[in-house]
């Protein structure tokens, strides 16, 4: 089963938008046992798209097109595919109802060109859009099938997961399937992680082990090809156990959509605990990161951004003498910030971030960061870290390290 992905959009060719859809679709199709042999990007040009379709149908059983389903004249994917297949475009009634409902609720006039979004290819199956207005299409002509999806990832991904995947499973049943498990690691670089599990990688067959470096973390994707899903999961578990026996100290969670922040928030939710923070160099980034996670309001009452020495004294009540003696970038300051914040917010935990993201300060080089951790009924501690690269990387690295310190403190109590 050979598939091809065609991304439509001049903005992709100009580099104005990164084609993340191809990555998502390739992984999803592979999981269904469908091999992707070609990926192509074409601009909003009907002639070039027509030429590409003619080439693609000579070499692929499934052609997946993403983008060009919107309301404007340059959104021409459906029109070109329909013309190529000598088929008409018809209005989808369900999509039309949702379109009218959207504009009625938003109290905006609906222009005529919006009707283009609810056109589907005659004789095909319509894919409803749970997060947008443009419907998709799935149509088979001869030995070639065409799947049309919207371009925005926040529309393409739900449409694929909810509508396209079941259609593809029915249309292209496979004897074997690929199932994957993603392991996430923090505090170890890709090169070190690969070195630690080199013997496993060198002898991998089924499952396979694929490392991926991400900002401030590393993931491993374990993938098995199997006819039996239960047996496949058992193989993944056996491989996971071998991996974690070597690098388990750095493991924090599973899944593509997971994060260190989400895992930490979930732990606090499970324990019914709260956290606050006093931030200097991170300027609220830690608190903002918590706020991105669902359920954060239950574990985070509020916090403090104390960038200057004056605000550390006035907002947190840290003594002028302590700051003059030890400096703001110090263990003593970090401890006081964490404990004062915890007391003021009446939280179970208090974190603090103080350091140097810009030019050297108080004799401390750029990248020096002290992170304090206060816990009700426990001695307050602070650790010093040294991060490289630019200002934002230093700040983001500090937040990640703070999350990991808190996560480890919580799980070590279990």
Swiss-Prot record:
It comes from the Bacteria. InterPro entries: CinA, CinA-like_C, CinA_C, CinA_KH, Competence-induced_CinA, MoaB/Mog-like_dom_sf, MoaB/Mog_dom. SMART domains: MoCF_biosynth (SM00852). CDD domains: cinA (cd00885). Belongs to the CinA family. NCBIfam families: cinA_nterm, molyb_syn, PncC_domain, PRK00549.1. PANTHER family: NICOTINAMIDE-NUCLEOTIDE AMIDOHYDROLASE PNCC, NMN AMIDOHYDROLASE-LIKE PROTEIN YFAY. This is Putative competence-damage inducible protein. The gene is cinA.
């Amino acid at each position: 089963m050979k598939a091809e992905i065609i991304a439509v959009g001049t903005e992709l060719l100009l580099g104005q938008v990164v084609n993340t859809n191809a990555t998502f679709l390739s992984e999803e199709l592979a999981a269904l046992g469908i091999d992707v042999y070609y990926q192509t990007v074409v601009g909003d040009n009907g002639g070039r798209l027509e030429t590409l379709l003619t080439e693609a149908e000579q070499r692929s059983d499934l052609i997946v097109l993403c983008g060009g389903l919107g309301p404007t004249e340059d959104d021409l994917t459906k029109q070109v595919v329909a013309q190529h297949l000598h088929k008409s475009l018809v209005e989808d009634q369900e999509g039309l109802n949702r379109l009218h409902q959207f504009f009625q609720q938003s109290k905006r006039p609906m222009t005529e060109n919006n009707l283009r979004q609810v056109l589907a290819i005659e004789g095909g199956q319509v894919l409803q859009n749970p997060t947008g207005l443009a419907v998709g299409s799935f149509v088979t002509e001869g030995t070639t099938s065409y799947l049309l999806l919207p371009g925005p990832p926040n529309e393409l991904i739900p449409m694929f997961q909810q509508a396209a995947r079941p259609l593809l499973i029915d249309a292209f049943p496979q004897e074997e399937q690929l199932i994957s498990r993603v392991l996430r690691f923090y505090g170890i670089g890709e090169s070190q992680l690969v070195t630690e599990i080199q013997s496993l990688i060198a002898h991998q067959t089924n499952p396979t082990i694929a490392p991926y470096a991400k900002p401030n973390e590393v993931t491993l994707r374990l993938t098995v090809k199997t006819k039996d899903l239960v047996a496949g999961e058992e193989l993944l578990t056996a491989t996971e156990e071998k991996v974690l026996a070597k690098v388990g100290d750095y493991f924090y969670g599973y899944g593509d959509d997971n994060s260190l922040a989400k895992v930490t928030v979930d732990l606090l939710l499970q324990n019914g605990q709260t956290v606050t923070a006093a931030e200097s160099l991170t300027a609220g980034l830690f608190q903002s990161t918590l706020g991105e996670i669902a359920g954060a309001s239950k574990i985070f009452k509020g916090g403090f951004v104390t960038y200057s020495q004056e605000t550390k004294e006035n907002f947190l009540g840290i003594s002028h003498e302590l700051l003059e003696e030890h400096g703001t970038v110090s263990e003593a300051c970090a401890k006081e910030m964490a404990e004062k914040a915890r007391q003021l917010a009446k939280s179970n935990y208090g974190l603090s971030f103080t350091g140097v993201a810009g030019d050297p300060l108080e004799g401390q080089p750029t990248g020096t960061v002290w992170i304090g951790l206060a816990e009700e009924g426990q001695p307050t501690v602070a650790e010093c870290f040294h991060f490289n690269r630019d200002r934002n990387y230093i700040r983001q690295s500090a937040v990640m390290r703070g999350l990991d310190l808190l996560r480890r403190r919580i799980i070590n109590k279990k």
